[in-house]
Amino acid sequence: MKEQKWIHEGLITESLPNGMFRVRLDNEDFILGYISGRIRRSFIRILPGDRVKIEISRYDSTRGRIIYRLRNKDSNY
């Protein structure tokens, strides 16, 4: 059975080494996010200030996988 995950939107606040980022979620929580393989293969640039969709495991809510970078028109803000 596939693991259930939460999907949230957030803002990249800090870039860390090895494709890791500090992400502030819309509910004001800070988590550590890493780039998914699909984004890494497509050479999509993620910079501080970008809005992203992040997938968070139910078992470890302090880390998440960045699955999509939102364009300005995709964002709610």
From Swiss-Prot:
Its main location: plastid. GO terms for molecular function: ribosome binding; rRNA binding; translation initiation factor activity. It is found in: Plastid, Chloroplast. Residues 1-71 form the S1-like domain. Pfam families: eIF-1a. CDD domains: S1_IF1 (cd04451). Gene3D superfamilies: Nucleic acid-binding proteins. InterPro entries: NA-bd_OB-fold, RNA-binding_domain_S1_IF1, TIF_IF1. The keyword Lipoprotein does not apply. Disulfide bonds: none annotated. Keywords: Chloroplast, Initiation factor, Plastid, Protein biosynthesis, RNA-binding, rRNA-binding. The keyword Acetylation does not apply. One of its GO terms (cellular component) is chloroplast. Belongs to the IF-1 family. Component of the 30S ribosomal translation pre-initiation complex which assembles on the 30S ribosome in the order IF-2 and IF-3, IF-1 and N-formylmethionyl-tRNA(fMet); mRNA recruitment can occur at any time during PIC assembly. One of the essential components for the initiation of protein synthesis. Stabilizes the binding of IF-2 and IF-3 on the 30S subunit to which N-formylmethionyl-tRNA(fMet) subsequently binds. Helps modulate mRNA selection, yielding the 30S pre-initiation complex (PIC). Upon addition of the 50S ribosomal subunit IF-1, IF-2 and IF-3 are released leaving the mature 70S translation initiation complex. This is Translation initiation factor IF-1, chloroplastic. It comes from Brexia madagascariensis. The gene is infA.
